[in-house]
């Protein structure tokens, strides 16, 4: 497996504990998310690159930070951050990364993506991997009735697991 340089932001997380921020104080966690967003797309992409195919816990910091970014961007007043993050997450979901990674990213999109993001994710409704297919279908359903026509068309054109999932 190719060695990926880990994001400097993961080093700011303490040892894992059973709490919302994995042991970091809420204010420190909020500053950490703000610093990542301030650094921009490269910082978020670096976290995504750090995700492992097998969720063995080795990449818990990247997963926690990507999740906290999604939660942060779910606040209505953060539309600018949400737009940037949605684009980065959608790009990662559409990439050739392992299905487990793409599925995780799609799960995070459920926290803040809306129906305007659905057309860009349409190719994933034909994905051959059930993990990705289930995650994108759940995402589209969570976007509400605005995605109904997209899902109906995708279901008509689908076969196998896709037909059941959609």
Q: Where are the regions a protein language model picked out?
A:
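Structural detector for internal amphipathic alpha-helices that build alpha-solenoid repeat scaffolds
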Residues: 1-2, 27-39, 49, 59-79, ...
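Positively charged, low-complexity intrinsically disordered regions
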Residues: 7, 83, 156-157, 164
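Surface-facing alpha-helical segments and adjacent helix-coil boundary elements at the starts of domains
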Residues: 50-54, 63, 71-72, 86-92
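Alpha-solenoid helical repeat architecture
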Residues: 13-24, 36, 51-55, 92-97, ...
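Alpha-helical scaffold repeats of the Armadillo/HEAT/TPR superfamily
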Residues: 83-88, 129, 158-160
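Buried hydrophobic core positions in alpha-solenoid tandem helical repeats
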Residues: 12-13, 46-51, 85-90, 120-122, ...
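N-terminal "cap/leader" segments of large eukaryotic alpha-helical scaffolds
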Residues: 1-31
């Amino acid at each position: 497996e190719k060695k990926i340089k880990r994001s400097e932001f993961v080093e700011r997380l303490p040892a894992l504990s059973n709490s919302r921020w994995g042991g970091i104080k809420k204010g420190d966690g909020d500053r950490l998310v703000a610093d990542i967003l301030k650094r921009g797309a490269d910082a978020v992409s670096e976290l995504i690159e750090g995700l492992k195919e097998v969720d063995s816990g080795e990449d818990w910091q990247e997963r926690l930070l990507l999740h906290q970014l999604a939660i942060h961007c779910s606040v209505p007043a953060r539309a600018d951050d949400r737009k940037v993050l949605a684009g980065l997450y959608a790009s990662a979901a559409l990439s050739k990364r392992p299905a487990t990674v793409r599925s995780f990213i799609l799960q995070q999109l459920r926290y803040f993506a809306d129906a305007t993001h659905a057309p860009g994710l349409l190719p994933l409704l034909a994905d051959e991997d059930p993990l990705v297919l289930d995650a994108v279908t759940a995402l589209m359903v969570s976007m509400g009735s605005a995605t109904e026509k997209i899902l109906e068309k995708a279901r008509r054109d689908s076969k196998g697991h896709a037909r059941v999932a959609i």
